[in-house]
Every structure is written in structure tokens, then in C-alpha cells.
Amino acid sequence: MLNYEVFSKENQPTEAEIKDFMGAEILELFSDLDDLLREKHKVKPKLAYSSCAMDSNIWRGWNIKYKKSGKSLCTIYPQQGYFLVLIPGKYFEVRNEDTVDEVKLAIEIRKSEISAKKKTKQ
């Protein structure tokens, strides 16, 4: 079941409802990534709704956006039993720890890109 089928656009889910929807088996991986983004990168998550119907609606529904210096660092799309991570230019389907490690590396690269662009504007 996809997240838009459970959470309507008009009814924003709570953090607890999103975690419950994803399921215990994937929650540790999500929490690991969320903690990294909040603590190391000092970004606050923001819930948003996407109406994108691409790829059989997997991008549709509530997502969690993380921005750094006004630029998208990544967006997490929670699904039942897994989650998708969209980083500008690439995406990952996270179902295991190996994929989370790939996502962490991609986030570090994205943060470096944002920092480099910020420095060239100064």
C-alpha cells in the first residue's frame, strides 16, 4: 500500500503515524538517516504533499523534505516496508542498511555541492 492511499492530502499525518505506517522492520534505517540529517547536518524536516503520478504513483503522497541553505538536500518518501530518498539527480529505494550507507554518501556529496555553490556566490 502506498502512502497516498492511507494519508489524504487534506489530513497531514503525524510523525508517529508515518513511522507506524512504514513498519518496525524499516524504522531503524529511517531513524538512522533522519538523525544524521537533523544532528550532523542541522536540518529540520518539513512535511509536504506531492501529487506526482510518475512511476505508478510511488512519488505521490506525504514526504519529508530536508533543506540546507534553502537548497534541497534530500526528500524522503515513506512507504509501507521501505522508503524512497530523492537527492537532486538520483534516487534510492531503501530496504536495507547497504542502501542507507549509499544514501549517506550521496547526502555528503550533495552537501558539498551546496557549500561550493554558496562560496562561489560570495
Give names to the regions the model predicted.
Residues 1-122:
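Charge-dense, helix-prone N-terminal extensions
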